[in-house]
């Protein structure tokens, strides 16, 4: 049973931001944000035609700065949020230096400007052109197509809170609630007036020694979407969005910086985390003294971990060892004994076989290691339309689309 070959798409700029178009459940579509210091940055809308195994694309200009994080509305296909760098420079006048002398004053201004220019990571909500919400039929090498621009809906004002790390949407919501992490602040926003206005509804701050900063966060799809998990330094924390109070804390979750985390979509107390200690850990938030399971398959920092939205035993990780690993964590999944069918559907002969099968949990294992990348893999994510397909993005701008091996797919389904 031969598997389909991976499909590779190359961006002309470096990139680290990737998201599926979450509200799109029919077409396979991903959004990729670039990081260029010299040129206008872009968002590439990537459509994957799985029948013909080809990629179609459209390009949107993102002129405000290099993109560090991108996320898509769960309710509106045309709405997305980005975190991006903006540089604020100090402007001084020669006249203010009086008798210092023109050449000395110019040197002073040059030094002051270079040292006082401030880079702030901001966040904004955007709308793509209406005709691009549902995809494209252009080929990847169609250079005649002109890039279109995004419509700015609103800024998330972070002038009082610091650098934005990420923006996450309420997973089951109407696209009106988002959370942003800015330095040591967690900020809950209400989007009003068709997302053209962001009102800060509530906030909380990390308290402690040193300069505490959030690195990532995820909104739990469970508990009526009232819980968010965050990572800062080596610590994982859970928050109740109704009171913005801390509900659990996993100190020293990793030996080094925690890079990412994700919730199991089918088991409400389970989450996965990854970090600079090269490990992926799985946690039960009811008992945080030690992880339920630990994976040590990567040889460098693990930047991303993602549960499959439908089959939670499938876990994707991406690392700066340039590899993507697909693991089968069936023993801690919602179906540890495999796919079980109703007794009424089993014949006597099949009954004996199913009893044999269900005596002990299936074994966890690495399904596949994907090595199509040649640079650090900063993002991996599952398609929101096809549970057997995923994308990975490396810093050199290479986007790779892969599928779960057919043999495993049929094993899970049958």
UniProtKB/Swiss-Prot annotation:
Region annotated Disordered, chain positions: 337-362
- State the WD repeat positions: 159-199, 209-249, 253-293, 297-337, 372-412
The cross-references to SMART domains, in alphabetical order and at most eight, read: WD40 (SM00320)
Q: Which InterPro entries match?
A: EIPR1, WD40/YVTN_repeat-like_dom_sf, WD40_repeat_CS, WD40_rpt
Locate the coiled-coil region(s) and give their ranges: none
User: Is Nucleotide-binding among the key words of this record?
Assistant: no
User: Where does this protein have compositionally biased stretches of type Basic and acidic residues?
Assistant: 349-362
The record's annotation in Pfam families points to: Beta-prop_EIPR1, WD40
Q: What does this protein do?
A: Acts as a component of endosomal retrieval machinery that is involved in protein transport from early endosomes to either recycling endosomes or the trans-Golgi network. Mediates the recruitment of Golgi-associated retrograde protein (GARP) complex to the trans-Golgi network and controls early endosome-to-Golgi transport of internalized protein. Promotes the recycling of internalized transferrin receptor (TFRC) to the plasma membrane through interaction with endosome-associated recycling protein (EARP) complex.
Q: Which family does it belong to?
A: Belongs to the WD repeat EIPR1 family.
Subunit structure of this chain's protein: Interacts with two multisubunit tethering complexes: EARP composed of VPS50, VPS51, VPS52 and VPS53 subunits and GARP complex composed of VPS51, VPS52, VPS53 and VPS54 subunits. Interacts with SNAP29.
**Protein name in the entry:** EARP and GARP complex-interacting protein 1
Identify the gene encoding this protein. Answer: EIPR1
């Amino acid at each position: 049973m031969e598997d389909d070959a991976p499909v590779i798409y190359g961006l002309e700029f470096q990139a680290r931001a990737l998201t599926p178009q979450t509200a799109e459940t029919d077409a396979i579509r991903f959004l990729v944000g670039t990081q260029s210091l010299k040129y206008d940055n872009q968002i590439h809308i990537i459509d994957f035609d799985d029948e013909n195994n080809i990629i179609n694309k459209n390009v949107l200009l993102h002129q405000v700065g290099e993109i560090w994080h991108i996320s898509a509305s769960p309710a509106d296909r045309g709405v997305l949020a980005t975190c991006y760098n903006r540089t604020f420079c100090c402007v001084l006048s020669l006249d203010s230096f009086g008798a210092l002398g023109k050449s000395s004053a110019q040197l002073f201004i040059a030094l002051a400007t270079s040292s006082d220019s401030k880079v702030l990571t901001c966040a904004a909500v955007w709308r793509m052109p209406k005709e691009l919400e549902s995809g494209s039929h252009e080929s990847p090498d169609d250079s005649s197509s002109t890039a279109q621009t995004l419509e700015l809906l609103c800024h998330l004002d972070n002038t009082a809170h610091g650098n934005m790390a990420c923006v996450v949407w309420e997973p089951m919501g109407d696209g009106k609630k988002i959370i942003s992490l800015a330095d040591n602040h967690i900020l809950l926003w209400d989007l009003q007036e068709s997302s053209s206005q962001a009102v800060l509804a509530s906030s909380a701050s990390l308290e402690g020694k040193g300069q505490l900063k959030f690195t990532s966060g995820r909104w739990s799809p469970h508990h009526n979407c009232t819980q968010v998990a965050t990572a800062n330094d080596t610590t994982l924390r859970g928050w109740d969005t109704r009171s913005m109070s801390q509900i659990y804390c996993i100190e020293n979750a990793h030996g080094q910086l925690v890079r990412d985390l994700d919730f199991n979509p089918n088991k409400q107390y389970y989450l996965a985390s990854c970090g600079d200690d090269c490990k992926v850990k799985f946690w039960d938030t009811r008992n945080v003294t030690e992880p339920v399971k630990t994976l040590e398959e990567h040889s460098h920092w693990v930047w991303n971990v993602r549960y499959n939205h439908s089959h939670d035993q499938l876990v994707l990780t991406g690392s700066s060892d340039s590899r993507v690993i697909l693991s089968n964590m069936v023993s801690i999944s919602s179906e540890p004994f495999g796919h079980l069918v109703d007794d009424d559907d089993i014949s006597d002969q099949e009954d004996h076989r199913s009893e044999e099968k269900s005596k002990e949990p299936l074994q966890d294992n690495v399904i596949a290691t994907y090595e199509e990348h040649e640079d650090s893999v900063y993002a991996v994510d599952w398609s929101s339309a096809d549970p057997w397909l995923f994308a990975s993005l490396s810093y050199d701008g290479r986007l790779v689309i892969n599928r779960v091996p057919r043999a495993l797919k049929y094993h899970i389904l049958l």
